[in-house]
From Swiss-Prot:
Function: Component of the velvet transcription factor complex that controls sexual/asexual developmental ratio in response to light, promoting sexual development in the darkness while stimulating asexual sporulation under illumination. The velvet complex hat acts as a global regulator for secondary metabolite gene expression. Controls the expression of the aurofusarin and trichothecene gene clusters. Also controls the expression of the deoxynivalenol (DON) gene cluster. Regulates hyphal growth and pigment formation. Acts as a positive regulator of virulence.
Compositionally biased region (Basic and acidic residues): 251-260, 283-294
Protein name per UniProt: Developmental and secondary metabolism regulator ve1
Family: Belongs to the velvet family. VeA subfamily.
Species annotation: Gibberella zeae (strain ATCC MYA-4620 / CBS 123657 / FGSC 9075 / NRRL 31084 / PH-1)
Any GO CC annotation of this UniProt entry: nucleus
Notes concerning its domains: The C-terminal PEST domain is a region rich in proline, glutamic acid, serine and threonine residues that is required for the light-dependent regulation of development and secondary metabolism.
Family matches, as Pfam families: Velvet (PF11754)
Localization, UniProt: Nucleus; Cytoplasm
Length: 532
């Protein structure tokens, strides 16, 4: 007869339970269950929609050992764990470690039992290490609510041979051949919330040994313990919010790395260099600036003129005249009218002569007499429409005086209107208001200036109007299918103008039908004559 007896031990970690029974074949069998690996902590997974996706198992996974001994006593008997022909499985259930006193008012805590999720049943695996025995492993057990719990393991046996059956069945509710043998409980363990969970520990040596023999156990090589805040003056709230602090520290580290990678654009040392920037390559050959205290003259406000008239002197200083691409474009539009004084004689200078220096320039101390403010900076860019207005003004003033315009193309065929390298050397000239227009220029002619004008704005006679081209025979939908725009009431329908007597003036006979073709013509079709 089966006589169960639970003998707890005082071991620190292992919990042992024993059971003895006598079979029909008069065999004395001893069962011994030992919890080799106790659960220590777990994280509550909750009962929401994300409970199954974000679930942590009990750490470390519980491992229970089973030994079967045949003999008069457990110490004198023979170990028949591998020779005994039967199947065993262990079922795990969860219970509170501290008994809850019953109260008069029912609360959700007392009504809802602790919920264990995962795989609560395990079959026995025969392993050689750490010792030859049968082992039950629970690698996938989770608890839904936080608290202090313990696991209860129930051992069931499925007997295969009749001589190993019990003399008297212990439980009539179980199917024949399945018997409940014994149960064992683990030590209490804590289930933390997701905020307070300290993290998973490194896998134990027992878990690694079991996994090496083919059992499905998750192995963690590193410690995944949450780092606590160890700052001075911290309280319990800081320890509880360790996850938030770790996130903030990581954010601060990312900010520091980002600030270390950022580069600050250095400030310009020369303030004049910022104002003189343009799309030209003048920065590569920039000459030294002249004295800041010098008053801006009218020469600085205009780009260099074309070669024919020795009018402007674009060289306020010798180094700037020789620099390529110094001027970035027309500064101001050309004046509309220029008042000239015929009393001044201009001596022509040969083209290959030396260039006058800055001290010999007659514009060094001359004010701008044409109403332009001398307070404007010489490098102020002008708007783009000034070129067209200059071309229009030049047509009106060609009879008296033709001012050089920056929009006229140079005779060398260059399209850079803002570069001095496109023009030949320009001779020195007198101030503008005292220019004489008498034709004593040698080989210089005004026609050389007017000649490129038709290229800039060609005046072409309008082309004769071409006859209309017949694209196809299709007509617009409105000309063929004209619709009436007035509203329709009481079942009225649109009137077809092709069948109206007033539009076509054609009335077919009763045995004929007319229809409109695609080209707009009316065709007649003869109906078949049937006798009724």
């Amino acid at each position: 007869m089966a006589t169960p007896s639970a003998i707890p031990t005082n071991s620190k970690r292992d919990t042992t339970a024993q059971f003895h029974r006598v079979t029909r074949g008069n065999r004395s069998l001893w069962y011994q269950l030992t919890v080799l690996q106790q659960p220590e902590r777990a994280r509550a997974c909750g009962s929401g929609m994300k409970a199954n996706s974000d679930r942590r198992p009990v750490d470390p996974p519980p491992v229970v050992e089973l030994r079967i001994v045949e003999g008069p006593t457990l110490e004198e008997g023979k170990d028949v764990t591998f020779d005994y022909n039967a199947n065993f499985f262990l079922y795990a259930s969860l219970e509170h470690a501290r008994p809850i006193a019953s109260c008069r008012v029912s609360t959700p805590t007392t009504n809802n039992p602790p919920i264990l999720t995962g795989v609560p049943a395990s079959g026995m695996a025969y392993l050689d290490r750490p010792s030859e025995a049968g082992y039950f492993i629970f690698p996938d057990l989770s608890v839904r609510h936080e608290g202090l719990y313990r696991l209860t393991f129930s051992l069931f046996e499925t007997t295969k041979e009749e001589q190993d059956f019990d003399i008297q069945p212990a439980d009539g509710d179980l199917p024949p051949g399945v018997d409940f043998r014994m149960e064992i409980k683990t030590d209490p363990f804590s289930v933390f919330s997701a905020k307070k969970f300290p993290g998973l520990m490194e896998s134990t040596q027992l878990s690694k040994t079991v996994a090496d023999q083919g059992c499905r156990v998750r192995i963690r090589r590193d410690v995944r313990m949450r780092k606590r805040d160890t700052k001075s003056g911290g309280n319990n709230n800081n320890n509880n919010n360790a996850g938030n602090n770790a996130g903030n520290n990581g954010f601060e580290r990312r900010e520091e790395d980002f600030g270390r990678r950022r580069t600050v654009t250095p400030a310009a040392e020369d303030p004049h260099g910022i104002r003189n920037r343009s799309q030209s390559n003048s920065s590569e050959h920039r000459a030294s600036y002249s004295d800041v205290s010098r008053r801006p003259s009218m020469v600085d406000s205009y780009p260099p003129p074309p070669p024919p008239p020795p009018s402007y002197d674009p060289t306020p200083s010798a180094p700037r005249h020789l620099a390529f691409g110094e001027s970035s474009g027309p500064k101001y539009p050309a004046p509309r009218q220029y008042a000239h004084q015929p009393g001044l004689q201009i001596t022509p200078v040969p083209a290959n002569g030396p260039y006058p220096s800055a001290a010999q320039s007659p514009y060094a101390k001359t004010d701008a007499p044409y109403g332009y403010s001398r307070h404007l900076p010489p490098s102020c860019p002008s708007p783009a429409p000034s070129v067209n207005r200059d071309l229009y003004d030049r047509r009106q003033s060609t009879s008296t005086y033709v001012p050089p315009s920056p929009s006229v193309y140079s005779t060398e065929g260059h399209y850079r209107r803002d570069s001095q390298a496109s023009y030949p050397p320009t001779p020195a000239a007198a101030p503008l208001p005292r220019m004489n227009t008498e034709p004593s220029r040698g080989s210089i002619k005004i026609s050389a200036l007017v000649e490129p004008m038709p290229v800039i704005e060609p005046q072409v006679d309008p082309l004769p109007e071409l006859p209309p081209v017949n694209v196809g025979g299709k007509r617009k939908h409105e000309s063929v299918f004209a619709q009436n725009t007035r509203p329709l009431f009481n079942g009225q329908r649109q009137m077809d103008p092709h069948y109206g007597r007033s539009h076509r003036g054609y009335s077919p006979d009763h045995d004929q039908g007319s229809y409109s073709r695609a080209d707009g013509q009316i065709s007649v079709i003869q109906f078949n004559k049937y006798e009724y």
